[in-house]
A protein has these predicted regions:
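Active-site-adjacent betaalpha module
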Residues: 1-5, 33, 40, 69-183
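A short alpha/beta connector and helix-capping loop motif
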Residues: 2-4, 19-51
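N-terminal nucleotide-binding beta1-loop-alpha1 segment
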Residues: 5-11
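Short acidic, Gly/Ser-rich segments with clustered Asp/Glu that frequently serve as metal-coordination loops
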Residues: 12-18
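Short, glycine/acidic-enriched loop or turn micro-motifs at the edges of active sites
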Residues: 13, 52, 148
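Conserved protein kinase catalytic core
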Residues: 16, 55, 151
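Acidic/polar short surface loop at catalytic or gating sites that assists cofactor/ion binding
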Residues: 54-73
């Protein structure tokens, strides 16, 4: 079994649906990576969901003016986990922010454990979560081939930025991470 706590960021219909303004082109690749990781983490898995706030405040007002389709309640279909994860083995943390390093997630991971991140989108919610957790002193591993971005260039740039935070944040792959656990 792999050490750490796997957090699967925002694997939701709004990012999976090719017709969505927020479609993630390599979503299926991220799904395949996440599915490969799940057995190694057993009950140490948390899924997250990005949700719109009931009433946007501050800079979020301008954000939702640009993306008005997203101002839907938490039970709207676009916010559901995609079909591959509709019945998640782990628990679900909801947040109206890009970063998912909430007190609830921090309590699940624990102060001395490492956080393993997968999901979408690499340059937004994954990056925001990784940096906040690293600032809190948590070791973070980002599984590159279990993540996807808005496009390949943004995905790669985000991974390069996170790699600058070594040793607090380390970019790895599914195979490398699972090999660390041994036979």
């Amino acid at each position: 079994m792999t050490a750490g706590h796997l957090t699967v960021i925002d694997m939701q219909r709004v990012f999976a649906d090719p017709a969505s303004p927020w479609a993630t082109p390599r979503y299926a690749d991220a799904v395949a990576g996440v599915r490969s990781l799940l057995p190694a983490f057993a009950d140490r898995v948390t899924f997250t969901r990005f949700l719109a706030p009931a009433t946007p405040a501050g800079a979020w007002r301008a954000y939702y003016e640009a993306w008005p389709f997203a101002l839907q309640p938490p039970d709207a279909e676009l916010w559901h986990l995609s079909d591959e994860f509709a019945d998640p083995a782990g628990q679900v943390v909801d947040a109206t922010t890009f970063g998912k390093w909430t007190p609830e997630l921090a309590a699940r991971v624990g102060p001395e454990d490492r956080l393993v991140l997968a999901g979408v989108s690499t340059e937004c919610c994954v990056l925001s979560t990784a940096l906040a957790a690293a600032d809190a002193g948590t070791e973070v591993l980002v599984v590159a081939d279990a993540c996807a971005g808005a496009d390949d260039d943004s995905h790669l740039k985000a991974l390069q930025i996170m790699e600058l935070y070594r040793p607090l944040v380390r970019v790895t792959t599914v195979d490398e991470l699972l090999a660390e656990a041994g036979p």
